[in-house]
């Protein structure tokens, strides 16, 4: 299984590799947000991927009907390979993200490569959104969830998490609040979007007042 959930552009080296893997018999799945169909992708993009053997779905496609569901967007960047390796972070599939094409000057982004038990959670997040977005055989999903990544010895831990319209708890906000409220030395945050509610502002303020080094890096171009 090669599963990819992220922003995507029309053509490029990565898509050529995905086509090659699909032709070799691998189960390749691509899911992207419906806003891409309004900005960067052609109207028949899903059909074109299907023709080369890539399973593809759109999260919350844009339709000519007014709906509050259009506020639900998929901004995750997740790639899972064979249930053993996963990538996540801020990188979409586009040339400007590796500075092969200049749109906004030099692009600085961050992504992580994970192996070990954390891969299982990212795979579950991807497959959950895949089943919600389209129709899929649940036994097929169970097959992939039963795959176990190789164990890795580590002195720390990695805990992937996700928010979606399916969750009623503010998982991401609670994670940040916990980190801020329990910090003793420093908290460094790098984010493209800084939209703080009063609770997060108070947590940052209290952390700074008790001597914690709180730093935030944001992009120069919003």
Regions found by a protein language model. Name each.
Residues 4-5, 9-222:
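Charged, low-complexity intrinsically disordered terminal segments
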């Amino acid at each position: 299984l090669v599963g990819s959930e992220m922003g995507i552009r029309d053509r490029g080296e990565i898509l050529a590799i995905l086509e090659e893997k699909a032709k070799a018999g691998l189960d390749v799945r691509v899911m992207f947000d419906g806003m891409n169909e309004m900005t960067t992708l052609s109207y028949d993009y899903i059909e074109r991927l299907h023709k080369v053997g890539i399973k593809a779905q759109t999260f919350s496609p844009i339709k000519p009907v007014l709906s509050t569901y259009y506020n639900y967007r998929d901004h995750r960047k997740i790639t899972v390979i064979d249930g053993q390796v996963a990538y996540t972070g801020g990188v979409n599939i586009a040339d400007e993200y590796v500075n092969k094409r200049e749109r906004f000057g030099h692009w600085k982004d961050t992504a992580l490569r994970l192996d070990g038990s954390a891969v299982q959670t990212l795979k579950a997040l991807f497959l959950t959104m895949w089943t919600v977005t389209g129709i899929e055989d649940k036994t097929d999903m169970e097959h992939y969830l039963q795959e176990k990544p190789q164990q890795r010895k580590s002195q720390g831990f990695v805990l992937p998490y996700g928010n979606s319209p399916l969750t009623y708890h503010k998982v991401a906000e609670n994670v940040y609040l916990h980190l801020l409220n329990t910090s003793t030395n420093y908290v460094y945050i790098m984010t493209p979007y800084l939209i703080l509610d009063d609770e997060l502002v108070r947590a940052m303020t209290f952390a700074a007042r008790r001597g914690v080094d709180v730093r935030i890096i944001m992009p120069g171009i919003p």
